[in-house]
Every structure is written in C-alpha cells, then in structure tokens.
Amino acid sequence: PLNKDGSICEPEAEKMLDTAIASGVTYIIDTAYPYHNGDSEPFLGRVLKKYDREDFFLATKLPVWNVNTLDDTKRLFQEQLDRLQVEYVDFYLLHCLNKEKWQKVLDLGLIPYFEEMKAEGKIRYFGFSFHDDYEVFETIAMGFLSDSV
C-alpha cells in the first residue's frame, strides 16, 4: 500500500506483512535497493526484525548500474544486509541485466565475489533478473552455469 505521494503507507504495509506471515505465507518479500525511492529495504528491515529469520524468504537485488568497482559492490551488498537487518538473503539477484550490464559484471569480477558470499552463508541462492534479447539471456545463463553459481 502506498500513500498519495507514492511513499510506503507503513502502517498498512506492516499490517499486510503481519497478516501474510500469520497466515503461513513464507515467500513474501521481493525487494531491491531502489524500490520506493530506496525506502523498501529499510522499511522491511524494521518490520521483519520482529520475526524469526527462518519464518520468511527474502529476495533483493544489486543495482548493477550503481556500481563501478568491486569495492562499490561489497559496500552496497553490506548496506543492503544492514538496511534489511538480516545476516543473509535467500535470493540475491543482479538486477535488470542486459548485454552492457552483463559485461560490467564480468569486468568487475562480481560472480566470484557473490560465490564467496554464498560460501559464507550471506546468500542462499544467487541469480539475475533480465531485460534484453533471448541471445543475451543465453549468454548470461551459460555464464552462470559455467561458473556454478
């Protein structure tokens, strides 16, 4: 639920999340760093901290367009964990990949870094969301498969 200005209507959104969790819904959260002008992750962190982390599945995404170095990526990933007030995310995606962003992922060495985060237990499943031609999708998918992500 949103307010008239497009911001999150926090009381209503919290009530909706509480109802979903009380009703047994476990996969309820799909967010990303820029959602709702950057307010989605902090809001969810505040609301979800009252629940056991194992009670829900959480997905968020790296805004690849906002990183220019591996250090940017590391900082942003940690910031997302902090904003969400969690030690790990269930599903972590490279957001809105296309041909140019995929090349950036390769150039910056992001996949080995996120494999390391998986090994450390900070990410359970790693993947990508996609916005380009099918041939580019195949290239990205094969890149993920060859790296055993």
Model segments located where?
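N-terminal small/glycine-rich loop or linker at the start of catalytic domains
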Residues: 1-5, 57-63, 93
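N-terminal binding-site loop/beta-alpha segment at the start of enzyme catalytic domains
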Residues: 1-55, 113, 119
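Glycine/proline-rich, positively charged
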Residues: 8, 65-149
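Acidic active-site catalytic centers that drive phospho-/nucleotidyl reactions
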Residues: 30, 61, 90
